[in-house]
Amino acid sequence: MAETPNSDMSGATGGRSKRPKSNQDWWPSKLNLEILDQNARDVGPVEDDFDYAEEFQKLDLEAVKSDLEELMTSSQDWWPADYGHYGPLFIRMAWHSAGTYRTADGRGGAAGGRQRFAPINSWPDNANLDKARRLLLPIKQKYGQKISWADLMILAGNVAIESMGFKTFGYAGGREDAFEEDKAVNWGPEDEFETQERFDEPGEIQEGLGASVMGLIYVNPEGPDGNPDPEASAKNIRQTFDRMAMNDKETAALIAGGHTFGKVHGADDPEENLGPEPEAAPIEQQGLGWQNKNGNSKGGEMITSGIEGPWTQSPTEWDMGYINNLLDYEWEPEKGPGGAWQWAPKSEELKNSVPDAHDPDEKQTPMMLTTDIALKRDPDYREVMETFQENPMEFGMNFAKAWYKLTHRDMGPPERFLGPEVPDEEMIWQDPLPDADYDLIGDEEIAELKEEILDSDLSVSQLVKTAWASASTYRDSDKRGGANGARLRLEPQKNWEVNEPEQLETVLGTLENIQTEFNDSRSDGTQVSLADLIVLGGNAAVEQAAANAGYDVEIPFEPGRVDAGPEHTDAPSFDALKPKVDGVRNYIQDDITRPAEEVLVDNADLLNLTASELTALIGGMRSIGANYQDTDLGVFTDEPETLTNDFFVNLLDMGTEWEPAADSEHRYKGLDRDTGEVKWEATRIDLIFGSNDRLRAISEVYGSADAEKKLVHDFVDTWSKVMKLDRFDLE
């Protein structure tokens, strides 16, 4: 669904003085903690006790859909609807809202409604979607906080499809709005839109990125580097869609289904005729961009991508027109009126076969994009397309399910899906969980089980590491991972290097024995899941470490986690959650391409941590000695498994001088300044808490003589927070 005018990333300065340099400008390699600040503040005008899920449940969804359906054919003079129907515009808006999602870190996607903010609102691929959102504004104002922009944009896409004759698979609300861009997202290394510096030598897009070009949702619709090469385009399509967890069948269904509707706009060259994007537009345009320099930006003069024309003879009806046109006719490349490469039919039969979008006396000829021809030229995609052509019902079902997946992929498990149109069928990509068909343990059983766990042969550090391994897979970006489900015991997690598989097998075996013995002993229907037992064991161990330091703490525990099975788990998809760096366990892979401390902060953001919470967490874990392979790296204490502030006291000690270790770029030796003897060993992750100015300021608080009790309580609070991040059933 590409519409891509040329643009750069510069904004109009209006003759004002240059922007003052930030610290990041002065010191580009300085560790940027700004992404954690997002987790420490509320920037929107929303009350502290506002519950969006509760408000959405009060919404009359049918009334909203009725208003949307009326809007579809209520063409506005300031932005007339193609063919008298806004449906294709709203499909593109919804697609481009959701289509930024990538599996690598779970960021992007429809959550937050971040298409409203830079840079996404000004990407060339999103040209004129500002108009779509303005068309929706009266409906958003009418229903207020009962429906978020994030939910409304996806709902508008669904209603658009339904209003043109297709039955969607379902719709779920529950996406809360953000009020700023997500500063944690790495959109790529380029300095200008529609450029690409993200491919390595074998042609693979850099790890973590989704799109192949800066400022585009997926790929260049003209073909790679603007060359009309369908075979090369197919490779880019497959790679980019794979990075949002779409296989060939889903990809083909989405493209074919989406391109069944509407047209692209290229009445003239966008580079010569369009004004600046919203972020660079003058203030009087009030956030609207891409104005036609010749004065007419709408109707038949509309310019978006520079590619011009419809795909089918019935652009506002669901039919087989796209697939039939693509497969049954031959196509040849040509430069369209906007100067971009597109494909024209060789057959006279298709010429002038489509009504004009605005002038009833005119006719247009269907066109195809290079990315469309790719579905015909690539043998695997073609096989799928031919199957769809022979089986229209299969095509429809595949499009319906792929559209549902596209627009809901970042919402997390099924219990977060709200509203009357949520399908009964749970999808494997939702990481579903079984229901608990037993009574949950109470306070008496919790105390009994904690005592039994601590009386076992398992150490404090083993229990802490296991609970952390289970819970820390959580990603707040797409709500995947976490301790619920106990997927730590399943493939692939049980064999991840960071989880020390042999030791993990021992720990889980002991916990499973305790679980079996407890469950078999109960005749009252009370049972405990392994998922709960893993977290309970970690809590008990942290409480023991605090007791070893003289502090009596009790970590709140709410049972209710369940154990998922292989049938609930798409094992390959969980590899995206495997950490290359787990700073909390001081695990660093040798082949990482970014400084370990950057990955530490990135992971902390996915856990929704602040800089202070991260600091307390690291200090506490080091004092406990909960390191990968039980190394002494960063364990600046003579009393491991004791929750103290020794890590900070010794990190800040000026009697220690640090130097890089000879055997690893990630390791350092702490030498006694007087004797030269090695006192400690550490990683970059440890030393960043004394090097970075902000982290050092926090460390100095925790390293004070009166701060140990504060550290213990802050660590316990942060630990408890992480253990419950995926407990959506408690919300």
Curated annotation (Swiss-Prot):
Co-factor remark: Binds 1 heme b (iron(II)-protoporphyrin IX) group per subunit.
Residues holding heme b: 259
Keywords, in A-Z order: Heme, Hydrogen peroxide, Iron, Metal-binding, Oxidoreductase, Peroxidase
NCBIfam families according to UniProt: cat_per_HPI (TIGR00198), PRK15061.1 (NF011635)
Family affiliation: Belongs to the peroxidase family. Peroxidase/catalase subfamily.
Cross-link (Tryptophyl-tyrosyl-methioninium (Tyr-Met) (with W-95)): 218-244
GO CC annotations on file: cytosol
Name of the top EC class for this enzyme: oxidoreductase
Protein name: Catalase-peroxidase 2
Chain positions covered by the region annotation Disordered: 1-26
Provenance organism: Haloarcula marismortui (strain ATCC 43049 / DSM 3752 / JCM 8966 / VKM B-1809) (Halobacterium marismortui)
Origin: domain of life: Archaea
EC number: 1.11.1.21
